[in-house]
Swiss-Prot record:
Pfam family, one: zf-CCCH_AtC3H23
PANTHER family associated with the record: UNKEMPT FAMILY MEMBER (PTHR14493), ZINC FINGER CCCH DOMAIN-CONTAINING PROTEIN 56 (PTHR14493:SF151)
Chain spans, region Disordered: 211-235, 396-427, 545-616, 652-692
Keywords in alphabetical order: ANK repeat, DNA-binding, Metal-binding, Phosphoprotein, Repeat, Zinc, Zinc-finger
Domain of life: Eukaryota
Compositional bias annotation for Low complexity: 211-221, 580-592
ANK repeats: 83-113, 118-150
Protein name listed in UniProt: Zinc finger CCCH domain-containing protein 56
Biased composition (Polar residues): 397-427, 545-560, 600-616, 652-667, 677-686
Zinc finger (C3H1-type): 302-324, 332-356
PTM annotation (Phosphoserine): residues: S568
GO molecular function terms attached to this record: DNA binding; DNA-binding transcription factor activity; zinc ion binding
Species lineage: Eukaryota, Viridiplantae, Streptophyta, Embryophyta, Tracheophyta
Amino acid sequence: MCGLAKKLDIEDTLTSLSDQENESLAKPMNDAAEWEHSFSALLEFAADNDVEGFRRQLSDVSCINQMGLWYRRQRFVRRMVLEQRTPLMVASLYGSLDVVKFILSFPEAELNLSCGPDKSTALHCAASGASVNSLDVVKLLLSVGADPNIPDAHGNRPVDVLVVSPHAPGLRTILEEILKKDEIISEDLHASSSSLGSSFRSLSSSPDNGSSLLSLDSVSSPTKPHGTDVTFASEKKEYPIDPSLPDIKSGIYSTDEFRMFSFKIRPCSRAYSHDWTECPFAHPGENARRRDPRKFHYTCVPCPDFKKGSCKQGDMCEYAHGVFECWLHPAQYRTRLCKDGMGCNRRVCFFAHANEELRPLYPSTGSGLPSPRASSAVSASTMDMASVLNMLPGSPSAAQHSFTPPISPSGNGSMPHSSMGWPQQNIPALNLPGSNIQLSRLRSSLNARDIPSEQLSMLHEFEMQRQLAGDMHSPRFMNHSARPKTLNPSNLEELFSAEVASPRFSDQLAVSSVLSPSHKSALLNQLQNNKQSMLSPIKTNLMSSPKNVEQHSLLQQASSPRGGEPISPMNARMKQQLHSRSLSSRDFGSSLPRDLMPTDSGSPLSPWSSWDQTHGSKVDWSVQSDELGRLRKSHSLANNPNREADVSWAQQMLKDSSSPRNGNRVVNMNGARPLTQGGSSVNPHNSDTRESDILDAWLEQLHLDR
């Protein structure tokens, strides 16, 4: 009995031991399943941004860095897989900003921990999550020490796996610039900065979690020194649909001229509240507002003081204030190709999307504007030449031209290029010295005394040449000229070069003199001073001495475009005769034949043309006896009973030149021969020759005085 009882006690002991072992083995298995379920709930709370549920579910702080399986789509592969993730990774993936802040409040949290087959970090998850709060999460992770240079299993850094929301296309640029920085971004920069070059606005808000979608709004203040801070709007102000707002991507609002000279420059006339980002006009206090480059002379170079916060010069600064003033400047707008090409979806793009949209660059400046030096030089030289040509009497260019100086694109009323090209204007005729000598001589003074008798038959041909020369400078002829009608800095120099290189141009010295600034200024001053005192080449009745005749010839020479040319072919002989004479006489009145009198127009050739019209095609140059008589009587004292001729100079010359035996001779004003007091004619050979020369000189002087 005792043995049986002992055997039963041993069996009971073994049974109790086996039950305890089974219980001890089953407890860890139950704890593992319970922990796995608990950790999965923790990851769910992290994905939903539920801070309270995450805090209740977190039983131990050591679980912060634990890894659990998370069902998600594998990156770069269209399939769903289970991957190991920490709570910080899941919260960063879905943009759960509150949970991320709660996890980072524990010092045990590891920021750069990598796990799973892809070896991703929390920064990789935040960059590839495409959440609306991804920028905030990335900045927060970087601010507490996350390393943006850690590669994953495929060698990709966080910047290489960026995925952004389609509602915020401009977010990629911001994230790329932030993640490329190797330095840690501090919290004070996040709170104080308001400019990265772009500002963001909320597009829509979810009623479930209050999260907002961000998109690139407009360019605001210039970049701060670190260039990483942006301004956020937690919610977007809802505006009613306004059909009157123009589409800034189509129509006239997308043209180059509007973008450069009107976009965000012209003030908006809408008095009601509307969306500024969809309006192409400027509004008070708008960051995108810019100065008119036609009124304010500034370059496309960014202002260094404005980048630091403010510029003391304000609108008078010579540099660009902001991104819009820099890239919409006529010197830089659409001078480069857009990297996105035709697939660009920007509302306002500063670049060209095809080669046809590229604006031409000027070789002298390397920008889309002409050189200001070339523009001013062309404008000054053209104005000087136009002024000189218009003030010259008898010049074909004296007629009023519809010529205006070229307008500078960056100056007053200036136009930039491509769409703001040079205005189409008529070009004044280039009358350079030494060219068209025959036309110059026709415009100089011409009278019957200067024309030899054998050349009188050529007057009709001279008149035809003068009319032909006038027709060549008429507007009708200039319209059919091969000379280009557009005036720009390049072809103006070509016009002068072509004129100088032409075969009819021979005086190289005159070119350098006429194109020099000193010659042009001196000529203009002389023309203005002598404009009122200019007389007709034939109407010289106010000139009573050879000195006045010389001054008159000098005035005619100064008024000619060819200042160094003689006034007429006989000018040299006239100067020699006037220099050798010291005679003076009074004005005897005018009794010249009607055909030799000057006309009202003052043209020396008009009498010959009128003869041709009145007498037929053949000109009668014979001298009638009655005309000769009138010519003689016109200079006699009998024809002027009220006036006495001053012939003292002739008597003095006769006394000085005559011999003692003929010293008592006097001059008969009606004849051409010397007479003695007794009336008999004395004709010694030497005396007759000398007296004949004196009378010839006297008659020539009378013709000159008339």
